[in-house]
């Protein structure tokens, strides 16, 4: 298969222009010609964007549709069994460590996984006969922005100090742990912390974060298998559940024998950080030099010069609406597109000015007989 990855920008910085750009992007895929669609709806924070994508897929696609991590009616759903592993996390805190005062940081109220994991927390607390008051539950954002706010809520004046804070994902867990450390709390001696998802960054954090590992790679593999299997019967759908695996670590007081794995993970993350820092530096200087450009050809020359220093990039093309030199504003993409900048195998082949049908996504000169992956 050739793979086209469409990634929206979201409402970063509360900028409406990003939303307009996302809405335009979701009109770009040739829905009728796709052999399969894999959706990660939980990564789309804008409700209107989600509904826009779902509407296009339902009305225009004639292929197997797979939704990962979120239930979508009429699609093949690859879901995580939140109950079994979240129960395992709570059991571990209560049975293995004897904790009774637990707090729970879930995700947004309207998020499928957030709802499931919170219900599981409440159910298990009820089973153990443990209370959970208003200040023991906090709605986060599944990201790192609300660690301080969550700690303010859990540690409010007059509230008993929690023995453990269970978070519905790893981003929030590391944010909470960082804030607790900043305030002088020891983890796990004063307050234990756990996450969920099994991100590698939980091993590089100090202390290593207790988590539940979600088999993302296997979910991706199964998605491709379903696309293969259901080419002739896309209307037949199924729900497949995957189990997460409990990974008790230092942040709850469990000193697991993962020293070698931790070292390997930290070495890989060090190498990845070096690549990311170099990429960021190259983009920074490229942006400065591009501000000096007066023509699109000069822009192409600058990009061609810097792409040699940016690891992971081999091909690059800039595609603009037809007539971009004459018109100042466009509503959506034009039927025909122009490619004024093209870099193939790190060789600058600009200026081509090649025109191509928008539905092709990329011009023929950038395509290959070998399977390709493009990020748009």
Q: For each of these PLM feature ranges, what is it?
A:
Residues 1-297, 308-309, 315:
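Bacterial carbohydrate/catabolite-sensing allosteric modules
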Residues 319-376:
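GAF sensory domains
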Residues 293-333:
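Helix-loop-beta substructure at the N-terminus of cytosolic sensory domains
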Residues 20, 297-300, 368-374:
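Short linear interaction motifs
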């Amino acid at each position: 298969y050739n793979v086209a990855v469409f990634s929206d920008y979201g409402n970063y910085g509360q900028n409406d222009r990003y939303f307009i750009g996302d809405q335009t992007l979701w009109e770009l895929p040739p829905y009728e010609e796709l052999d399969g669609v894999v959706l990660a709806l939980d990564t789309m924070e804008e409700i209107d964007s989600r509904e826009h994508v779902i509407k296009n897929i339902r009305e225009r696609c004639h292929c197997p549709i797979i939704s990962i991590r979120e239930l979508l009616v009429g699609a093949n759903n690859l879901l995580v069994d939140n109950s079994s592993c979240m129960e395992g996390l709570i059991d571990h805190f209560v049975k293995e460590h004897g904790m009774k005062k637990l707090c729970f940081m879930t995700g947004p109220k309207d998020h499928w996984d957030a709802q499931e994991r919170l219900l599981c927390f409440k159910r298990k607390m009820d089973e153990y006969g443990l209370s959970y008051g208003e200040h023991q539950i906090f709605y986060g954002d599944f990201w790192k922005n609300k660690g301080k706010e969550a700690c303010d809520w859990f540690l409010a004046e007059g509230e008993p100090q929690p023995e453990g804070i269970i978070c519905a994902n790893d981003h929030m867990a590391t944010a909470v742990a960082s804030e607790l450390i900043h305030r002088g709390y020891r983890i796990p001696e004063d307050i234990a912390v756990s996450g969920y998802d099994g991100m590698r960054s939980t091993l590089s954090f100090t202390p290593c974060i207790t988590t539940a590992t979600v088999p993302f790679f296997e979910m991706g593999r199964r998605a491709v298998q379903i696309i293969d299997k259901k080419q002739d019967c896309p209307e037949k759908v199924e729900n497949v559940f995957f189990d997460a695996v409990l990974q008790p670590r230092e942040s709850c007081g469990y000193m697991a024998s993962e020293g070698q794995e931790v070292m390997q993970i930290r070495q890989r993350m060090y190498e990845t950080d070096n690549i990311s820092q170099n990429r960021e530096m190259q983009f920074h200087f490229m942006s400065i030099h591009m501000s000096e450009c007066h023509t699109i050809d000069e822009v192409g020359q600058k990009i061609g010069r810097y792409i040699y220093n940016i690891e992971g990039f081999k091909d690059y093309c800039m595609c603009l609406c037809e007539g971009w030199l004459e018109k100042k504003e466009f509503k959506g993409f034009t039927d025909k597109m122009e490619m004024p900048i093209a870099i193939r195998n790190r060789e600058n082949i600009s200026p081509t000015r090649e025109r191509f049908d928008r539905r092709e996504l990329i011009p023929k000169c950038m395509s290959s007989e070998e399977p390709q992956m493009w990020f748009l």
